[in-house]
Every structure is written in C-alpha cells, then in structure tokens.
C-alpha cells in the first residue's frame, strides 16, 4: 500500500512524485481517521463525548477535502476524472 513507503529507489523518484506520495498517504490517513471516528461516534454512550468525536471527525473530512483538492490541482488526470464525476447526477458505475 502507498502508506508503506516507496517501492522504487528514492534517488530515482522525482520531487513531484514524492510530494504526490505524501499527499496520497495523507489522504489515506485522513479517510482512515474519519472511519475510526465514525466507529467511535456509533459506540459512544456519552452524548457530550459523542458530539466532540463527531466534530473531530468532520475536521478530518475537511483535511481530506483539502488534500484531495491539492491532488486535483497537481494531477491533470485526477482533475479530469473528479470534474467528470463529482457534483453531478450522472451514473457513477460503468455499466
């Protein structure tokens, strides 16, 4: 997986690819944090703590959106695909 590090010698990887790796790893971590907070919110019995955990989860969603936007701006193919699929009512799956 991408968060396990580089799969090619670091000297052979461009700065741009290394930055993209950082961004993809960060996006994965933010989405994982959202998942963990969702589970904590579901399991939590204390309503005050549940509200705090939900707030923290939503901040992770903001972080994920920021990183995804950085990726979109840096990668023309992601830009095209995200513009094609996000915020539309068109079919998502290829049928």
Describe these PLM feature segments.
Residues 1-95:
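Iron-associated oxidoreductase/ferritin-like identity signal
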């Amino acid at each position: 997986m991408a968060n396990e590090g580089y799969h090619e010698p670091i000297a052979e990887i461009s700065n741009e690819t290394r930055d993209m790796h950082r961004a993809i790893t960060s996006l994965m971590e933010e989405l994982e944090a959202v998942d963990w907070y969702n589970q904590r919110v579901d399991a939590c019995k204390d309503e005050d703590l549940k509200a705090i955990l939900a707030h923290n989860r939503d901040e992770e969603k903001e972080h994920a959106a920021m990183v995804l936007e950085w990726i979109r701006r840096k990668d023309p193919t992601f830009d095209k695909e995200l513009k094609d699929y996000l915020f539309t009512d068109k079919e998502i799956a290829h049928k």
